[in-house]
């Protein structure tokens, strides 16, 4: 959740 959006299984937002 670097962008503060929904966290995925990768730990980052879906926009990334």
Swiss-Prot record:
Signal peptide boundaries: none
GO CC annotation, single: extracellular space
Tissue specificity note: Expressed by the venom gland.
GO-annotated molecular function: toxin activity
Keyword Nucleotidyltransferase: no
Subcellular location, record wording: Secreted
Chief location of this protein within or outside the cell: secreted
Keywords: Bradykinin receptor impairing toxin, G-protein coupled receptor impairing toxin, Secreted, Toxin
Miscellaneous: Is hydrolyzed by angiotensin-converting enzyme (ACE) by only 6.7% (compared to bradykinin).
Family, per entry: Belongs to the bradykinin-related peptide family.
Function: Inhibits angiotensin-converting enzyme (ACE) with a Ki of 61.8 uM, and targets B1 bradykinin receptors (BDKRB1). In vivo, induces hyperalgesic effects in living rats after intraplantar injection.
Protein name, as recorded: Bradykinin-related peptide Cd-146
Source organism per UniProt: Cyphononyx dorsalis
């Amino acid at each position: 959740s670097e962008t503060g959006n929904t966290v995925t299984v990768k730990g980052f937002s879906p926009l990334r």
